[in-house]
């Protein structure tokens, strides 16, 4: 019989936190008691889990010794302050922020796509959930990488506003309403108007001209694959879509791979659905395929006419589910099933 765990959700009132609750319930995760946590501003609110209304508790006052596992998605500053406290109290943390992703002794995990040595969850009691855009790309590319190797990845992302949070969703909806009614758009969340627009600017700009979001895809892909030789060249774009991230990916492979062989590899890959029938204009989109689902959807699979070892893909996923909450819960399932009973955490 599986062990039922006491679980805390840090950031339970946010977009990802709410989806944590949904995914835990859908996947019937074995929970004894669940504690929704947020800042003091959210105390007094309730969340629904398994037909029960649960009071949101103040994170600052919570005793993490009550729980076995904590899922964090409340921003990097919150994770930096409270994740070590949770571990010190004997709790294991799955963190959805970028706070710990680049530390050598903290695993960065996409279940099924990470190397075997990146599955040592016991080093510091913290497991990092990768960036949403990295997750969906790595899930789709891992079968190809295993088969023929990958030398270079060129990727352009088309990322929905839900990746920024609830305020960004509200701003997009408000801007559309204002503009359609002849009023100027009120710009607060993004540096420029997002409605009817595309912004090649996600996170801060780095000294090399790339954004932090783009560099996340470089660092994280290499860490997950444990292959620093992979060259990754991203351009991250925010688009006026509420849910679902899309990516145009162009690969330089170490050996040639036909489009048919790539489809066959991907069709067998866990967590991947191929949608690629051009005669029926069938290719994946955020609205039709990704939103509300946990798979990564791949289409427009074709050999690159400009390179003998080139392959092009279109990759779509729900950024709040597989790109965040579902991936974290899948990590939690591995912990619960394989590791949690034998963790030896630092004191």
Curated annotation (Swiss-Prot):
It holds the Pfam family Semialdhyde_dh. NADP(+) binds at residues 13-16, 41-42, 162-163, 319. It comes from Legionella pneumophila. GO terms for molecular function: aspartate-semialdehyde dehydrogenase activity; NAD binding; NADP binding; protein dimerization activity. Homodimer. The keyword NADP applies. HAMAP family: ASADH. Transmembrane segments: none annotated. Substrate binds at residues 159, 238. Belongs to the aspartate-semialdehyde dehydrogenase family. It catalyses: L-aspartate 4-semialdehyde + phosphate + NADP(+) = 4-phospho-L-aspartate + NADPH + H(+). The active site is at 132 (acyl-thioester intermediate), 245 (proton acceptor). Its EC number is 1.2.1.11. The keyword DNA-binding does not apply. It comes from the Bacteria. This is Aspartate-semialdehyde dehydrogenase. Catalyzes the NADPH-dependent formation of L-aspartate-semialdehyde (L-ASA) by the reductive dephosphorylation of L-aspartyl-4-phosphate. CDD domains: ASADH_C_bac_euk_like (cd18131), VcASADH2_like_N (cd02316). SUPFAM superfamilies: Glyceraldehyde-3-phosphate dehydrogenase-like, C-terminal domain (SSF55347), NAD(P)-binding Rossmann-fold domains (SSF51735). GO terms for biological process: 'de novo' L-methionine biosynthetic process; diaminopimelate biosynthetic process; isoleucine biosynthetic process; lysine biosynthetic process via diaminopimelate; threonine biosynthetic process. It is an enzyme of class 1 (oxidoreductase). Coiled coil: none annotated. Phosphate binds at residues 101, 216.
